């Protein structure tokens, strides 16, 4: 079993590396094509291979845009089978972190919560794979305040690391009532860049396909690389007006890393993207949108 998993993982990484090399070559050809069409100087870094790239441009067409990629491999059952989400915490969780994990369990339809105990990460991931879990969520805290969320897609990855801030739990709001557990409609806003679409896929594939008559809405809205999570239910007051009610919880997510492997492969998995906060332009740049 372990040999089979290692072989499948190597095959997946090989496909991913080949796709990355092909994407890089395609980007260079696109830059050369734009320079030729606009009658501009060829970029310096492309001049040595300009003739070879121009020769291969003649055989390119728009037909390869929709071919399958490693993303199809990761989420090949998305929309066909409902995701199976497992939620756990860091070791020795406080009472508030346990409450937050319980609320997250209600956010994702069909999710299960597992007490961490003294289990190691590798044992958790192996147990999740053996039971057909598609996504493992781990919540971290600092002095009782949730500060981190890890979303690991199984069995091959990716694993996204988020910082949590401005967390408002349902337990903090009196007389809120019960939460609907219907399959929600999803709204994703502001994920226009290539990385933004990647993050949007990681988040939206945590939810099953909703029914048309569902009155539950979950929003992931990106602004300046901070992803706002909001949870609402709506009801029609008449044939023209709709009443929107926030039911919580609410929080902000800040992406700081995406790894290609699963959670237990931190030491060996390649980093797909990492936020570098200490560069001079870190405050000015946005990565999840092109606006």
UniProtKB/Swiss-Prot annotation:
Residues 83-264 form the Brix domain. One of its GO terms (molecular function) is snoRNA binding. GO terms for cellular component: fibrillar center; Mpp10 complex; nucleolus; nucleoplasm; preribosome; small-subunit processome. It comes from the Eukaryota. It is found in: Nucleus, Nucleolus. Keywords: Nucleus, Ribonucleoprotein, Ribosome biogenesis, rRNA processing. One of its GO terms (biological process) is rRNA processing. Its main location: nucleus. The keyword Ribonucleoprotein applies. Component of the 60-80S U3 small nucleolar ribonucleoprotein (U3 snoRNP). Required for the early cleavages during pre-18S ribosomal RNA processing. Part of the small subunit (SSU) processome, first precursor of the small eukaryotic ribosomal subunit. During the assembly of the SSU processome in the nucleolus, many ribosome biogenesis factors, an RNA chaperone and ribosomal proteins associate with the nascent pre-rRNA and work in concert to generate RNA folding, modifications, rearrangements and cleavage as well as targeted degradation of pre-ribosomal RNA by the RNA exosome. PANTHER family: U3 SMALL NUCLEOLAR RIBONUCLEOPROTEIN PROTEIN IMP4. Part of the small subunit (SSU) processome, composed of more than 70 proteins and the RNA chaperone small nucleolar RNA (snoRNA) U3. Component of a heterotrimeric complex containing IMP3, IMP4 and MPHOSPH10. Interacts with MPHOSPH10. This is U3 small nucleolar ribonucleoprotein protein IMP4. It comes from Homo sapiens (Human). The lineage of its organism: Eukaryota, Metazoa, Chordata, Craniata, Vertebrata.
């Amino acid at each position: 079993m372990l040999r089979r998993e290692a072989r499948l993982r190597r095959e997946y990484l090989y496909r991913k590396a080949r796709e990355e090399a092909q994407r890089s070559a395609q980007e260079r050809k696109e830059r050369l094509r734009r320079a030729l069409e606009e009658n501009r100087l060829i970029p310096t870094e492309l001049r040595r291979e300009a003739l070879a790239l121009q020769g291969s441009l003649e055989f390119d067409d728009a037909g390869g845009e929709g071919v399958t990629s490693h993303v199809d491999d990761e989420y090949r059952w998305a929309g066909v089978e409902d995701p199976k989400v497992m939620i756990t915490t860091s070791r020795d969780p406080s009472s508030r972190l346990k409450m937050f994990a319980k609320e997250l369990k209600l956010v994702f339809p069909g999710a299960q919560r597992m007490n961490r105990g003294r289990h190691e990460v590798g044992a958790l991931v192996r147990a999740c794979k053996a039971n057909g879990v598609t996504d493992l969520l781990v919540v971290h805290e600092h002095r009782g305040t949730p500060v981190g969320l890890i979303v690991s897609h199984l069995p091959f990855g990716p694993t996204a690391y988020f910082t949590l801030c401005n967390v408002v739990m349902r337990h903090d709001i009196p007389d809120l009532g019960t939460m609907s557990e219907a399959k929600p409609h999803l709204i994703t806003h502001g994920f226009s860049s290539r990385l933004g679409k990647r993050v949007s896929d990681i988040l939206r594939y945590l939810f099953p396909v909703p029914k048309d008559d569902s009155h539950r809405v979950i929003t992931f809205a990106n602004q300046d690389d901070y992803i706002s999570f909001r949870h609402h239910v709506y009801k029609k007051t008449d044939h023209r007006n709709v009443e929107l009610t926030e039911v919580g919880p609410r929080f902000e997510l800040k992406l700081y890393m995406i790894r290609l492997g699963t959670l237990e492969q931190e030491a060996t998995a390649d980093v797909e993207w990492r936020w570098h906060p200490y560069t001079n332009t870190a405050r000015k740049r946005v990565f999840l949108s092109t606006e």
